Every structure is written in C-alpha cells, then in structure tokens.
Amino acid sequence: MASHSQVLVEEKSSVRILTFNRPKQLNALSFHMVSRLLQLFLAYEEDPSVKLVVLKGQGRAFSAGGDIPPIVRDILQGKLIRGAHYFKVGYTLNYVLSTYRKPQVSILNGIVMGGGAGLSTNGRFRIATENTVFAMPETALGLFPDVGASYFLSRLPGFFGEYVGLTGARLDGAEMLACGLATHFVPSISLTALEAELYKVGSSNQTFISTILDAYAEYPHLNQHSSYHRLDVIDRCFSKRTVEEIFSALEREVTQKPNDWLLATIQALEKASPSCLKISLRSIREGRLQGVGQCLIREYRMVCHVMKGDISKDFVEGCRAVLIDKDRNPKWQPRRLEDVTDSMVDQYFERVEDEEGWEDLKFPPRNNLPALAIAAKL
C-alpha cells in the first residue's frame, strides 16, 4: 500500500475525518502515519475553517498500536536513532492531541491498543462500542505503557491503572466507559447516524459536540465477570509499593478466596518482563504527580534506554517472541524480579547521554495550555 493512502483524509464542511487505512495490519501505526497525523493536526489547528477532527479506523481495529517490527529491525541493524525518531514524532503527536485547542472525536469501534490508545485517550472525546477491545500489552513485549499512559492510567479510579498497565488486561467498551478511558458508549448500529450529525457541526464548541454525543450515548451494564467489579481487590493488591509486594498480595488473596480472575492476573504478571514490570509501576506512580508533557518527556527517556539495550534487551526479545517468531516464549534477562535491582530501574529514568544524536524530547510551542499539560523540565 502506498504510504500516502495509510491515512485517508475526508472533508465534510468544517469537519475533517482521518481514517487509519491499514486494516490487514490492524491499523498499526507506521512512521509515515504518525508523521502525517502530526502534520495534519498542526495544520487544522491553525485553519479557521476546521472546527472538528474525527479519527477512525478501517476494518476491525481503530489501531492495534505502533508498527514495532521495523523498529526492532532498526535496533538489530544498529540504527537506533531511526527508532528514537519514530517515538519522538509519536510522543509529540500525543502531546499535541492532549493540548489541542479544537475538539476531536475518536470512534473506537474495534481494537484499541498501545499507540492506538495514546492517539485516542489523549484526545477530548472517545467513543466506545460493543466491539471495542482496549489494552496496554507492553509489559509482555519487553516495553512499558507509554504514549502518555503514565498520565492517563495513573488517573483511573483507585489503582485500576496499575492493574491495566502491568497485566495488559483487556477491557471492553462498557469497562472503558466505567473507568473513564471512554467518554461515551454508542452502539455500533448508531454510529452512521452519529457521524452524520457530527459532520454537520459548524462550531468548535465542546459543549455543543458533547450534546450531540450524549443524544446517541447509552450506559451499558458491566459484564458480571468484569475486572471492574473487583476494584476492592485491585486496590488492596496493586496499591502495594513494589511489584514483589503486589505478587504477594495477590497470592494471599488466592489462599483466602481462590478464583479464575486472580489466577489469570498472577499468570499475566508471570509472563511479563520482570524489568518492565518494575519500570512500569514506577512510571505510573510518577505520572500521578506530573503533567502529561512531563510524562511524555520521561517516557521518551525510558523508551530510548529500552531501545539501546544497555540495561536489558527484553524489548527485542519480547517482540521476537510475540510479533516476529510468535513462539510466545520470551527469554527475559533478568529472568527473576529479585534480580532487577533498584539501580537498574533508576537508569531507565535518567537522561540519555548526549551522544550520537540522543537528546531529550522537545515539544513545539503551544499557546494557552491548561495546567495538566505543562511540560516542565525533569
């Protein structure tokens, strides 16, 4: 597919509709896509004729995340700066979306994971449906929840964000609405009518657009097996200070009242990279006290260290096992939580030495930013 057709652009009066168009790849975000999206969003913000931007995905996914295999190939070929540039552009796009002066609506009628979650959750309106599947599966890939996840996961009720970020748990549309990851739930059968109403919008007034969305929104019941029904257990366990203490708390729950959900949660943690569990927990905890810009700057430092592989090579190994060879049997190093020391974790949060082009993330100038977006120096 020609790169220019990976993001389809449609104009409907004062509305711009951007559609991810890599359905066979579940709309995995290529470098061209994130670059094009950044260019378009910046242009639309300055164009007085554009009042609203709508994001959609072709096929059964909004976006399953970043297009990671090319980045892994770059790492293996020693072209780390190319991978860093991909994340730099992607995180800048996340920042622009989180500070955007015009309303944008993301229609999440399918899979929403990783980078796809960043594009939607950093925006103003997120529309889930009965087809929505949300996850941040990074710890199983040798990575950590990024794209601003340390900001938005840390602001979910209680310690639900730690649970979602560490386990990679999948949420449906009703759960997304309940925890705040989605702003509205609209049955997929109503999307055509909703979009037709949105395309008539001649205003950037957030309240006006919210009123349109409210008219089509429903409040679905949570599935009886939903993890959101277990907030008390999640808070007891995932509020612990360390990953080791989280494991111990879950194991105590199992001895007192064993059930399939607890066992599945422990199993998900056991499959994840020990290093990435520890840096993910710290990242989310730090995110509670930081603006979204600060979170993205820190996450960029972290992802650069992950790519360099000086501390651990789990990113390449995890992607090999899950995305490339697909044997789903990663050989993590270190293999045990107790072998991941505090000093190793600390290194992920330090500035990358200014060599070979490495430098901290810098955002384009933004005007009239809310306090949540302030990108203070770390």
UniProtKB/Swiss-Prot annotation:
Compartments, as annotated in UniProt: Peroxisome
Motif (Microbody targeting signal): 376-378
The keyword Hydrolase appears for this protein: yes
Keyword list, A-Z: Branched-chain amino acid catabolism, Hydrolase, Peroxisome
Pathway: Amino-acid degradation; L-valine degradation
GO biological process annotation, one example: valine catabolic process
Protein name: Probable 3-hydroxyisobutyryl-CoA hydrolase 2
Enzymatic class: hydrolase
GO MF term (any one): 3-hydroxyisobutyryl-CoA hydrolase activity
Lineage top rank: taxon: Eukaryota
Family: Belongs to the enoyl-CoA hydratase/isomerase family.
Gene3D superfamilies found in the cross-reference section: 2-enoyl-CoA Hydratase, Chain A, domain 1
Catalytic activity, reaction form: 3-hydroxy-2-methylpropanoyl-CoA + H2O = 3-hydroxy-2-methylpropanoate + CoA + H(+)
